[in-house]
Each structure stands twice: as C-alpha cells, then as structure tokens.
C-alpha cells in the first residue's frame, strides 16, 4: 500500500474504539491515542511547546476555542509530525465516529492512484466534508475530484508528505485553532482572512475532495463529540495587557514593573528611554505625549485585546489578570474610566 491508515481515538472512549475495530476488520491500520482535552491545561500546553491563537473566535458563535478542539487539533498535528519524521508518503486519517465502506484499502488505493494521475500537485483530499461555499466550486474540472472551497470536517481525509510538512512549517503549533479551520486557512480558501497573518503560508495547501464521499459521520457523532461539548477556554492571562508610560527607569517605575511581575501581568512600558516633552504635571497639562505613545501602541494591537492603561510612577498592581478581567466584565462596558478601585 502507498498509504498508512491512522484512527484517532480517545483512550477513555472504549466503545468507539471497539466499534472502529469491528468496522476495520481485515484492514491494516494504527489506532492512535488522541490528545484528551480534559487532561489539558495551560501548564501542559507550555510543556508541549504549544500555544493557542488567543485572537481566534468561533465564526458562528463568537466563543473561544474549547479544550476538546485543542485536543483534536493536537491529535491531527501529532500524526503529521510522526509521518514527516518517519517519511510516510501518504496518511489516511480517520476519526473514530465515522462509517466506512467495505474494502476500504482497495478504495483508497484507487483514489490515490487517480489523484496522482489527475492532479499532480494535490496535497490533501477530503474523503468526507461539509462544504460551506459549494457554489464556488468547479465540479467539471476533474473526473473524480473537486478543488474545494471553504469546507468543514476532519473526520476522514488523505494527506501527503508535502502537505503535512506545509502544516508543520506554518507555525500552527504556536497558533492552535480548530483542525477544520486551519486547513482552509492554509489552503487560502477561508473567508476569515484576519487570521492568515498568524501563519507562515509561503505556498497554499492544495486541497481537493472526492466528488462522492466514501465516509460519513455516524448519525449521533456531533451529539457525542468531545470537541463540541467540552469546556470553553477562558483566555484570562493572555487577554489582559497593562500599558503604562515611563520615560525614565525611576524607583517608582521599578516598583510598578515588579508588582506586575509578582501578579503575572503582561505589561508594556511606553516611551522608555525617550526624552519627556509633555511638561510638568504638577504645574500644568502634561498628558499629550502620553496620548501619542498610547495611539502608536494601540495601532499594533488586536481589536479584541483587553487593555488596562495606568500611571506607573505612583502605582503598584495588587491583583492578577483573572481578577481584574472579572471586575472589568462586571461593568458590562467596553471602556471603564477611573477604575482604580477595581484594579489596585
């Protein structure tokens, strides 16, 4: 065979595993233990050298990513890494909640053979998918395949070595989003263009699909899905940025910076080592230069970033980002002025 079949299954999901073993009787495959989102936290992500794309929001609900989605994404990513390290030419990746046809390997052999004949530059081919913009697809270009537009699902697909290498090279592990969102982004077929800048996309991933799906999600697949039904991640530590102006490293500024470090607050000192031209606050207005520093800094930040702007020379922080953000959210306002009592 010119491919290796991988089945992604959570260790605690014994029933799904046993069903897939029966469905794949007579086939050669590797049962791959999935990364369990229930066992992940920010410390385990750090140990894995993995980071979330904190700016990502679900395009339909606006929520953050779930721990189950992170586990799913890492499960697929780990297979890519394994195949690249072991020079596996083609990987067939199946999730454990799909129905598959009989004589799967024979069908896959024919699909890969036809892919190589019809489309020399293919890198990923869906075996099942949920097309979102099917009206944009040219179904007459190829006999057995279609060059896809924006599509969902990663429950069954073929990906070759070049495609897996592209995903690894994209810096995906430092900007994790759901698995079925990253593929359209890397293929330059996602409508969510704001996220493209976070990935190294030198050449788009060449994504196709079989015209007639050969695998289908089980009828209750989404009801029992760990990705859909797991805990939404609160981005407290990553969402808050403390901004303060300080042109000279005085004792007061050192105390302020030290207090930020004690409470684990991400902070940025604006204007450090810049000549102060704003005047003496004791004798008259002196804030104009601060505003200019702030405007320049805001231009480089994401629109979703939560910011605390504060003085520095006569201020120390006395709460962590989670507590500050919870108090900020309790106001139910985008901007809160004179919020000293809520923050320090």
Segments from the language model and where they lie:
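An acidic/histidine-cluster motif and surrounding catalytic segment
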Residues: 1-94, 98-237, 251, 275-276, ...
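Hydrophobic targeting segments
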Residues: 3-7, 238-244, 260, 267
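Active-site-proximal beta-strand/loop segments in catalytic clefts of secreted hydrolases
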Residues: 10, 127-130, 245, 272, ...
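Conserved beta-strand elements of beta-rich interaction domains across eukaryotes
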Residues: 12, 214-215, 247-249, 274-275, ...
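N-terminal G-site helix/loop of the GST-like fold
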Residues: 21-26, 252-267, 330
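Active-site catalytic motif of lipid deacylating hydrolases and related acyltransferases
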Residues: 28, 259-282
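GT-A fold catalytic core of metal-dependent nucleotide-sugar glycosyltransferases
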Residues: 83-126, 293-344
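Short coil/turn segments at secondary-structure boundaries
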Residues: 254-258, 272-273, 321-323
């Amino acid at each position: 065979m010119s491919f290796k079949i991988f089945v992604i299954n959570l260790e605690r999901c014994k029933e799904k595993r046993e069903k897939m073993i029966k469905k794949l009787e007579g086939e050669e495959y590797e049962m791959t233990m999935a990364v369990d989102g229930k066992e992940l936290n920010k410390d385990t992500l750090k140990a894995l050298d993995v980071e979330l794309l904190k700016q990502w929001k679900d395009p339909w609900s606006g929520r953050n990513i779930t721990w189950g989605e992170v586990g799913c994404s890492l499960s697929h990513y780990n297979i890519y890494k394994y195949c690249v390290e072991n020079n596996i030419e083609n990987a067939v990746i199946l999730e454990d909640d799909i129905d598959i046809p009989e004589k799967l390997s024979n069908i896959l052999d024919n699909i890969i053979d036809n892919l190589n004949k019809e489309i020399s530059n293919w890198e990923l081919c869906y075996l099942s998918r949920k097309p979102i913009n099917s009206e944009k697809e040219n179904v007459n270009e190829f006999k057995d395949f279609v060059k896809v537009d924006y599509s969902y699902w990663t429950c069954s697909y073929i990906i070759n070595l070049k495609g897996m290498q592209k995903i690894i090279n994209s810096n995906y592990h430092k900007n994790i989003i759901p698995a079925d969102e990253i593929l359209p982004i890397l293929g330059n077929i996602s409508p969510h263009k704001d996220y493209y800048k976070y990935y190294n996309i030198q050449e788009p991933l060449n994504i196709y699909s079989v015209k007639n799906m050969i695998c289908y999600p089980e009828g209750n697949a989404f009801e029992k899905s760990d990705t859909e039904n797991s805990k939404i991640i609160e981005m407290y530590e990553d969402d808050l940025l403390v901004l303060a102006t300080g042109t000279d490293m005085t004792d007061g500024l050192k105390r302020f910076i030290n207090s930020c470090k004690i409470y684990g607050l991400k902070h940025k000192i604006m204007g450090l080592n810049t000549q102060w031209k704003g005047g003496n606050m004791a004798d008259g207005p002196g804030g104009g230069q601060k505003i200019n520093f702030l405007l320049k800094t805001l231009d480089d930040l994401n629109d979703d970033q939560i910011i605390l702007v504060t003085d520095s020379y006569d201020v120390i922080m006395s709460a962590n980002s989670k507590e500050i953000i919870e108090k900020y959210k309790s106001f139910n306002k985008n901007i809160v002025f004179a919020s000293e009592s809520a923050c320090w």
